[in-house]
Amino acid sequence: MVEVVSVREHDRWRGVYVVELEDGSLRIATKNLVPGQRVYGERIFRYNGEEYREWNAYRSKLAAALLKGLIELPVKEGDRILYLGIASGTTASHMSDIIGPRGRIYGVEFAPRVMRDLLTVVRDRRNIFPILGDARFPEKYRHLVEGVDGLYADVAQPEQAAIVVRNARFFLRDGGYMLMAIKARSIDVTTEPSEVYKREIKTLMDGGLEIKDVVHLDPFDRDHAMIYAVMRR
């Protein structure tokens, strides 16, 4: 087991920590909200009485976006976030660490089998609220979700940007942030990724979202990008 030499909070990403190991390598991590719990087999680091979970960029598109130079991490302590396509909770668990017990993640997932996996994660993570539903129809879970500070989407649907806009109009406050992981091949297998990205960005802009940054996630995820935007009502 590689020993931890030091842990410090990242200069720009609040709630994200840089772990230095004795072999000289650096890893990013979040402080574990549920000490002792692993979510996806990630490494656990212990230092000065605290426990940190390695944030694996090959398993989490948000971690990949940070390592690829996303201008900022808008997620912060106490935030309320709507997560579309939460799946089994890999990325959401790190967001859960960052927002802490005062924050809340409303996690929408369409697949019952995947939802069962998520339920094992949220049993101890009281700030994640799972919703079995279809992100295309936000009106069907409107009664379960309060207004949110942020929206994160990873739904791999052909109309992903339109789905995001629909949900943003329902739930995202003015000035709230949106992070959308986009896989070009899930939207249109016949079109080059750059053209797909442009088309989806136009849909977001037409829906009132001001684009702040777009980063491509190679080599962590081929043909993926992360779009960061802010809602302007």
Swiss-Prot record:
GO biological process: box C/D sno(s)RNA 3'-end processing; tRNA processing
Alphabetically ordered keywords of this record: Methyltransferase, RNA-binding, rRNA processing, Transferase, tRNA processing
Keyword Disulfide bond belongs to the record: no
UniProt xrefs under Gene3D superfamilies: Phosphorylase Kinase, domain 1, Vaccinia Virus protein VP39
GO MF term list: histone H2AQ104 methyltransferase activity; RNA binding; rRNA methyltransferase activity
EC assignment: 2.1.1.-
The keyword RNA-binding is assigned to this record: yes
PROSITE patterns the record matches: FIBRILLARIN
InterPro entries with a match to the protein in the record: Fibrillarin, Fibrillarin_CS, SAM-dependent_MTases_sf
Binding site for S-adenosyl-L-methionine: 90-91, 109-110, 134-135, 154-157
UniProt cross-references to SMART domains, sorted A to Z: Fibrillarin
Subunit structure: Interacts with nop5. Component of box C/D small ribonucleoprotein (sRNP) particles that contain rpl7ae, FlpA and nop5, plus a guide RNA.
Purpose: Involved in pre-rRNA and tRNA processing. Utilizes the methyl donor S-adenosyl-L-methionine to catalyze the site-specific 2'-hydroxyl methylation of ribose moieties in rRNA and tRNA. Site specificity is provided by a guide RNA that base pairs with the substrate. Methylation occurs at a characteristic distance from the sequence involved in base pairing with the guide RNA.
Family indicated by similarity: Belongs to the methyltransferase superfamily. Fibrillarin family.
PANTHER family given in the database record: FIBRILLARIN, RRNA 2-O-METHYLTRANSFERASE FIBRILLARIN
Protein name: Fibrillarin-like rRNA/tRNA 2'-O-methyltransferase
Gene it is expressed from: flpA
